[in-house]
């Protein structure tokens, strides 16, 4: 499909060769990523203690990420304290999220959210974007990650804003 699209662009647009090459070089990786991200779980590569590239090449949204952290879908506040004062309950099982952007890189945070077990085999944090090897999953949830690739990137975008001290204790 990408080859046909490229041939169409070349034949139907009088763009100078070097410029067209640059355009295709910029667009082609996105098309490849889109093809790889058709399933429920995005492919990823763990390198240097993290997932260096955003899942599916997506850019997260801070507001949606904050809503996921505060809401029941992400349920992060069950274990972590975060600067979300409108929520009465903040857990203390996991480390506080205040200042997490100073302690962890985007790549480390991404792996922590996708599959924390790869960083710490004894963690109680669930894998939010893995489906293989899980037990005790409700039949209607088998094969479906807790968060989509886009939602993971939204959470990461929000966590990267948390570089300050706690708003409350």
PLM ranges: what are they?
Residues 60, 64-67, 96, 104, ...:
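Extracytoplasmic/secreted proteins, especially bacterial periplasmic and envelope-associated proteins
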Residues 107, 111-112, 118, 129-169:
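C-terminal capping alpha-helices of c-type cytochrome domains
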Residues 32-36:
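Boundary at the C-terminal end of the N-terminal hydrophobic targeting segment
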Residues 37-71, 167-169:
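Electrostatic cytochrome c docking/interface patches
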Residues 55, 77, 81-115, 124-138:
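Gly/Gly-Pro-rich "capping" loops immediately C-terminal to redox-active cysteine motifs
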């Amino acid at each position: 499909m990408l080859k046909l699209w490229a041939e169409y662009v070349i034949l139907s647009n009088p763009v100078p060769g070097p410029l067209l090459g640059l355009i295709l070089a910029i667009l082609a990786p996105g098309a490849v990523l889109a093809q790889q991200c058709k399933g429920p779980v995005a492919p990823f590569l763990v390198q240097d203690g993290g997932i260096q590239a955003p899942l599916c090449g997506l850019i997260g949204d801070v507001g949606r990420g904050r809503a996921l952290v505060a809401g029941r879908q992400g349920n992060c506040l069950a274990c972590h304290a975060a600067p979300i004062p409108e929520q009465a309950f903040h857990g203390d099982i996991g480390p506080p999220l205040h200042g997490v952007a100073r302690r962890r890189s985007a790549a480390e945070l991404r792996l922590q959210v996708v599959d924390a077990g790869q960083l710490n085999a004894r963690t109680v944090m669930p894998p939010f974007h893995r489906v293989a090897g899980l037990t005790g999953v409700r039949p209607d949830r088998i094969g479906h990650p807790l968060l989509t690739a886009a939602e993971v990137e939204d959470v990461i975008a929000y966590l990267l804003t948390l570089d300050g001290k706690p708003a409350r204790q």
